[in-house]
C-alpha cells in the first residue's frame, strides 16, 4: 500500500502531507526548526506575494541562492501559485546567469547574499524581471522578510493541472546555450511511486533526510520534494561542506542522503571521518557521475549502510535506473553497472541507424516513461530531435548485459561529467575561441581521481603568439563558471577533425582512457 495518495498535482499531495504531519518538523537548519503547518502558512504568503507582484500562473520565478529553508518556502510558494520555479546554478558566470534569466523570461528574482555583487553587476541586462528580492539585507532591493510582511497567509486555493510546469531546470546544450527542461506535475508524480518501490521504501514520517545537494540541481530538487512527500524531517545545509556534513550526521542522526561520488570521496579523506558515528545512516543514494569501485567499497565499509546507485537525467526527472544494495556485492559483477530500469520506465539501446541493439552491443540509451519532461522551453528544434515517438534520446551510450543490467559505455553527445556537474565541450570551446590569440580549440574529459573527470583543452594559437597554460585557464574563468574551465591545456598545431570538420574527440580522449576499461570515468 502506498504511503501517500495518488493525485493529479504535486500541490494536492503537499496539501495532504501538511494535514497528516502538521505538527511534525519539516525542516531544520542550524538551530531553527519549522513544522509542516508553518511551512504551509509561509508558502501561502509567498504565493500571495507572487500574485501581488503582477505574476500569473505559468510565470517563471527565479532563485539564485544556496540551500535554505527560505528557498524551500519559495519552492512551495511557486507550487501554490501555479508559477514555475527556475533554480539558477550559483556556479554560473555573469553572462550565463543573464542568459538563463532572460531565456526563462523570469519575472521575479530572489537573490541570496552570496550573489549580491554578481547580480548588481548584471541587473541592467535583465529583460523580464519586475523585481529583485534580497534574501537578506540590501541597500537597494527589498529584503525577503520585509517583502513577506506585506502579504497575508490565506490559502490561494488554486487548482492546478496535471500538465502544469512545476520546475524549469537548465541543462547545458551541445550548441553551447543552456536549455530549460520543463518538468510537470505529471513527471514528478510519476517518479514518486518509483522512488517508493526502491530507495524510498523505508522512508516515513520519522526519517531524517539530509538536503545537501544544491536545489538548482535535479538531485537536490528531487530529494527535497521526496522528503516532503514522505513526511521526513529535512535537515538543510547551504552547500555540501564535508566538515559540516560529518558533524550533522553525528548530531542530527541523519538516516538518508543523496551524494555525488566526489563528495563521498571527500568525506572518506576528511580527517574527521574516522571519528564520525555513521550508525544512524540507513542509506546513501548516489549518482550524477561514475564512482570507482575502490571508493564505493571503502564507503560501504566505513559508513556501514545500504548504497543505492541512480542513473537519470534532468530531462527524465532524475529517473532511469537504480542499482539496489544487494547488487553492490563485488562477486556479483554489477558494481560498474547503473542498475535496472524502475517500474514504469522503458529503456532501449539503439544503433546509429535506428535499429535496436542486441544484448551486449553498445548504442544510444533511450528512455520512455511518464517522467520524461514536457520539453525544452521554447526550443522546438531541440524537442523534435530529442523526443521521438515518446522516446527520449539521452545522448549516453551503453549496453545491457545478459541479466538486463545497464552499463554506461560512452557519451554520444560528448558531455563531460565532473563532480556531478554536466559540462558540454561546446560551451568551453566557445569561451576559449573568444580569446583573440586562439584560432582553434577542442576540449575533452580526462580521468581525475577526485572529480571522476576533468576538462582538458587542446588549443592552437595564432602564429607568433605565446601563452602559458595558466594564461588560458585564467582567461576561461573570466568567461564561464570555474567548474567548466580546463584544468590542463595542451598547445598543438592542428585540432584533429574529420572531412566534414567535426572534431575527432575520440582521438584526443583515447590516450587518457586506455587503461580505464571504459571511455567515461
Please annotate each region the language model reported:
Residues 116-162, 177, 270:
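ANL superfamily adenylate-forming
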Residues 71, 92, 98, 109-111, ...:
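AMP-binding/adenylate-forming catalytic core of the ANL superfamily
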Residues 229, 254-259, 268-332, 346:
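Gly/Ser/Thr-rich phosphate-binding loop
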Residues 2, 6, 23-68, 72-76, ...:
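Conserved AMP-binding/adenylate-forming core of the ANL superfamily
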Residues 340-344, 353-385, 421-423:
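Conserved ATP/PPi-binding loop(s) of AMP-dependent carboxylate-activating enzymes
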